[in-house]
Amino acid sequence: MSPAAVPAGKRLRADLAIPAALGLWSAAIALAPGPWFKIALAAPPATAAAIWWTLLRPHRWLAAFFVFLLLTPPLPIPLGDSGVHTAPLLAAVGLLAGLIRMKEWRTTVPPIAQAFGWFIGALLLSLPFAALYSGPDLAERSLLRVGLFAISVYVFLWALSGPRQPGTDSLRFTRFLFVVGILAALFACADFYFQFPAPAGYEQQFVWLDDGVLRRAQGLFYEASTLGNFCAFFLVMCIVALLRPRREIPCPRPFLGIAGLIFATALLFSYSRASIVAVLAACVTLAALRRARIGRVLAGSAAGLLIAAALVQYFVPSFAATYWARIENSFAFALVAPNGVLTGRLATWTTLAAFLTDHPWHAIFGIGFKTLPYSKFAGTELVADNTYLSLLVETGVIGLTAFLFLNWRILRGGLAAARSQNPRAAFLGQWIFCFWAGEMVQMLSGDLVTYWRVLPVYFWVLGTAIREAGAPS
């Protein structure tokens, strides 16, 4: 029916319907009794508009997801160990975007995607044993943790095979991620120096100094080791980028140098020795990959860390003295008192090894993913602080084998991209390959599978590197 055929009265009512609804909505907000009630009335339309805007372009949900993931703290809601975070809601929007644009996905399933699927399947396979040995409530929490890890896998799949707007520049999005990372590291430095009130769900990690007690730098993450691992990731990027031509990197060299100092300073404030070891392992890998003199790479990395150490010495001298004493004692007592150097990890590993020796059948399927810290089934509540041992006990040989296979696929995919003729793929491939080599070293002293706040960033770089390696040079 043409507009002319519609009676004038109906056209007038239709034209007035939307303005009238907006007016009534505005009046309801104005007359609402309190600020929270006003927010409740205003939120649904504003949220719907934001979701609609996000879905208009393929990359928008991902950009919003990373901003919320890295730059917002958890909400002070008493649910779980660390409160509730808003980033999974953005991941749900991303899932909706993927469903809407289903026809734009690449249909080929590469072997690395299958490796991710096998590992998630192994985690899910352990959940019935979590319910059997530790109760259904703990099994439900373990299922949620598998879901958090699955978010990182979805980000990887999106970067690898998801919809992409024509003319998309991976280096431009890398620059965006880099800036977001710098903001997160800057906040971590400010948080440590000024000791802001801790966000909900933070770990109680402190450094005892002669003139007081300081909370280790955690930034907007849940604990200090996550921050240290995150800073190590971008510090490796700075090192890789400084060895490549300007046209192949996302930022100018002076900017990379300044950012490297920020990440190195935040890394020192996190008080994480394992993250420094990861950076050194990544540098050795980079030197071997580029067939460069290892001294050149290590000298540049050491210079950056020394400058950052000088900044720490200037602003927080008592912390610097304690930090260097800790490093010195780590070398001095490594053979004399290894359990003390490893902050009790050796005793924990011995306990878990004894548990598997006494109950070898649990080494097949495990006792349930992420049950060790919350269940006394192994004798007492334990934090393994070792990704490999934790997976062996909690998911059995099946889970550990799937995880090792996944790591092999990650290294193989990163190495193939690093050797690509596509300069973007080569840069991203060198970055993720070298970092993941260091990551596998750091896994010996931490359960890095649970770092769901930072794994999506790592897997986006991995997926983009592999995708760019298959694109024309």
Spans of features found by a protein language model:
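Transmembrane alpha-helices of multi-pass inner-membrane enzymes
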Residues: 234-237, 295, 409, 431-473
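Aromatic-anchored transmembrane helix interface
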Residues: 85-94, 114-124, 136-161, 181
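Hydrophobic core segments of transmembrane alpha-helices in multi-pass, intramembrane catalytic enzymes
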Residues: 40-47, 85-95, 144-156, 226-244, ...
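Transmembrane signal-anchor hairpin modules in multi-pass inner-membrane enzymes, especially those
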Residues: 1-131, 168-171, 175, 241, ...
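Hydrophobic transmembrane alpha-helices and their immediate junctions
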Residues: 394-440
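Long extracytoplasmic/lumenal interhelical loops at the membrane interface
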Residues: 335-395, 414-419
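Alpha-helical transmembrane segments of multi-pass inner-membrane proteins
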Residues: 46-51, 120-124, 128, 154, ...
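A membrane-periplasm/extracellular boundary helix in multi-pass inner-membrane enzymes
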Residues: 186, 192-196, 270, 287-336, ...
